[in-house]
Amino acid sequence: MFASGARVAVGVSGGADSVCLLHALVELGGLKLSVLHVDHGLRGAESRADAEFVGELAARMGLPFCLREVTLGPGNVEQEGRRARLRFFHEQLAAGNCDRVALGHTRSDQAETVLFRFLRGSGTAGLAGIRPVTAEGIVRPLIELERAEIEEYLRERQIPWREDATNAGEEFARNRIRHGLLPQLAAEWNPALVETLAHTAEFARAEEAYWAGEIDRLSAESLTAGDGCVLIRTESLKALSLAVARRLVRRAIQMAKGDLRGVDFGHVERVVELASAPTGRGRTQVPGLDVRRSFEWLRLGVPFTRKPYSLKPLVPGTTQIPGTRNGISLELIEKSETSVLPWNVYNTEMGCLDWKRLAGSLELRNWRFGDQYQPMGLTGSEKIKTLFQLQRIPVWERAQWPVLTDGESIVWTRRFGPAAGFAAGPESGVVLKLGEVTIR
């Protein structure tokens, strides 16, 4: 967990576990230690006394001490407190103030966590419990020891610690598990329950480590990151076994929202069902995400909105499409420069318009309901919405779909190309070449 000479910040609450950890690391030697403490201010004078106790302990040991005072927002106090502590620890690591943050979680904490998550219906990811080492640099050296062993260590050395009165109350679910359910199950079913649950976490972590590599590979093949969203082909999901499809959906959710906070089995299952539905459309919700089905695509992301735009494009030049990283490039070309290829190639591949047929009042805007025109190759005018449906273009791609007009006439649209009445032909002298580019 530690390299010799590593800078290790120890998160110390003042309780038995963290006090034991600090003393043990001092005894171990060879590390550059510092002490971190978070005061949530929830217990008034007692919270301040905890902070003073930890500060004095650090001073006696000659260690740097960093105190963070936080005010918790509304909601689950236990959960918000944990998030505040982890945020502080991650900030210390990100700022380069330490190489590792050591926390005092024990095997007893592990057992409580696994049992709690099992009761809530967690899969193997949740049953993996508390990780001994995280990628961010948080380590838990006491994770193989039970709480009773920790307290015995402190009593033998006559080392004092602080007792948090809220740990004895019944208002928090974890306390009810710690003081009620877990001892009862151990007494009536399995005396070695703490060890059994810890082994369950170890087994689940190994499973998750294997699947992480497999899902990394599948994600690269099946998931596409877009602007504020992740896209999945429904056929890709349907080709997988249900177990793998669920894991891939979890990864897509994590990519789209940054974490899996608040996401449960039911959310994942609804996304899988949406992908498998016979209809090519539908919608469901995941905490923090809107999930839409359109034809053979799923989109997981923030809700997309249509943002109307109307621009005078640069000729020549590139005009960026608002809300996207795409742009429309326009270039005037003399006929002599384009005569080496048949005209139909230029019209279909490049989107060339006859400059003389244009009145010069060009406007670049997004598609609107009711828009219609006659693309080259069609015998009559068609609504662009119908073209979208024929080409199976997802609804979210249509919102900023570019249309080039000249006066009241649509002369070009993405994918469907030049209008028949404005397309360049053999008689054209100067042509307007259109193209789409990605703007970095």
UniProtKB/Swiss-Prot annotation:
Subcellular location(s) per record: Cytoplasm
Main location: cytoplasm
Binding-site list for ATP: S13, G14, G15, A16, D17, S18
Catalytic activity: cytidine(34) in tRNA(Ile2) + L-lysine + ATP = lysidine(34) in tRNA(Ile2) + AMP + diphosphate + H(+)
A single GO molecular function term of this UniProt record: ATP binding
EC number: 6.3.4.19
Keywords, in A-Z order: ATP-binding, Cytoplasm, Ligase, Nucleotide-binding, tRNA processing
Claim: ATP-binding is one of the keywords in the record: yes
Gene Ontology annotations of biological process type: tRNA modification
Record flagged with keyword Ligase: yes
Enzyme category, top tier: ligase
One GO term describing the cellular component: cytoplasm
Alphabetized Pfam families for the sequence: ATP_bind_3 (PF01171), TilS (PF09179), TilS_C (PF11734)
InterPro entries (alphabetical): Lysidine-tRNA-synth_C (IPR012796), Rossmann-like_a/b/a_fold (IPR014729), TilS/TtcA_N (IPR011063), tRNA_Ile_lys_synt (IPR012094), tRNA_Ile_lys_synt_N (IPR012795), tRNA_Ile_lys_synt_subst-bd (IPR015262)
Function in brief: Ligates lysine onto the cytidine present at position 34 of the AUA codon-specific tRNA(Ile) that contains the anticodon CAU, in an ATP-dependent manner. Cytidine is converted to lysidine, thus changing the amino acid specificity of the tRNA from methionine to isoleucine.
Classification via NCBIfam families: lysidine_TilS_C (TIGR02433), lysidine_TilS_N (TIGR02432)
Free-text comment about domains: The N-terminal region contains the highly conserved SGGXDS motif, predicted to be a P-loop motif involved in ATP binding.
Family: Belongs to the tRNA(Ile)-lysidine synthase family.
Name of protein: tRNA(Ile)-lysidine synthase
Naturally occurring in which organism (per UniProt): Solibacter usitatus (strain Ellin6076)
Source species taxonomy: Bacteria, Pseudomonadati, Acidobacteriota, Terriglobia, Bryobacterales
Gene responsible for this protein: tilS
